[in-house]
Amino acid sequence: MIFLPQRSMAAFAPADDAGQSPISESPAGGDVAEAAKSEDATPPSVDGGDSAAADNGASVLERICARTRLDVEQRMQVLPLKEIAAKAKEVSMPTRGFGQALQHITADKRVGLIAEVKRASPSAGILRPDYDPAQIALSYQRAGASCISVLTEGSCFHGSVEDLKAVREACSLPILRKDFILEPWQVHESRLIGADCILLIMAILKEEQTAELIALARGLDMDVLLEVHNEEELNKALAYDSFLIGINNRNLKTLKTDIQTTLDLAPQVPPDRLVVSESGIATSEDLAKVGEAGCSAVLVGESLLREEDPGLAARRLLGF
């Protein structure tokens, strides 16, 4: 079992009951499912070949963002922003407290695991031909994971909102929706499909966008994980009202990983923030290193999903 230095968690005091937003047992309705069908059913290759490198020299990140904007525009034609916002406000099932779940692990001076569920990635291609998001998430929960991350981006990761809904039904852990969130429409959708936290990537958002999306998510009782890749992005992220800071060890343009990114940046994060190291964590030794650097949790997917039994791999990573 991996232990870590304790960080101050005063910022994660439980929310007042009155602040909980009313939500229903079925967070996603038919309109959202219908909107999701507008996504192109034939996503581009994710095998890292020519289709993942060209497009007028644009990076994989830029291509995914362009695709996401087009997808959201199409889905808004089916379910306009005003309508999906109204539906999100009507959800009555409480969120599960993503940040608080990590707080409990940190209080025990352990490094928590956010175990990821995804079918594919641009760098690795299809990870599991037998992909069953619900069963994978359940195996993670049994292995001792603190939270689950679900990739819902369709064009390069072959994910969908249906994956997240299936995971929510299968397990009781808090869920991070991992996607390229650029528009308020996606935040409302996240609440409808059952997400407890959303990922916001500093590299793809302008300052006013970031502030708007954080406020919207918080207003819907979801936590926000702000993802950074370098010191400049970290300094910007620390100015916002979000206590979850994710340090991504993957260069989103080259797709290479290096946990030295976390080792360099994590010590710069104030103790009242909770730090998550993302990507490139493969062994319990890696877990120990980032824990010693000040991380409260790690987000791991690919190294687990490559194993025959992802749950057993998660247990080994945690040192159980």
Q: Can you say where each PLM-predicted feature lies in the sequence?
A:
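C-terminal helical cap(s) of enzyme catalytic domains, especially alpha/beta-barrels
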Residues: 7-12, 265-268, 306-320
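Glycine-rich phosphate-binding active-site loops on the catalytic face of alpha/beta enzymes
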Residues: 189-208, 247-254, 295-313
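Glycine-enriched alpha-helix->loop->beta-strand junction motifs that scaffold or abut catalytic
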Residues: 144-145, 170-173, 192-198, 218-222, ...
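Active-site mouth loops of central-metabolism enzymes
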Residues: 117-132, 174-181, 225-227, 277
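Conserved, mostly hydrophobic/aromatic
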Residues: 64, 115, 140, 190, ...
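Alpha-helix-loop-beta-strand connector modules within alpha/beta enzyme cores
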Residues: 158-180, 211-225, 260-274, 317-320
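Catalytic cores of alpha/beta
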Residues: 182-193, 232-240, 281-298
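An N-cap/entry alpha-helix motif that binds or orients negatively charged groups
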Residues: 3-30, 34-128
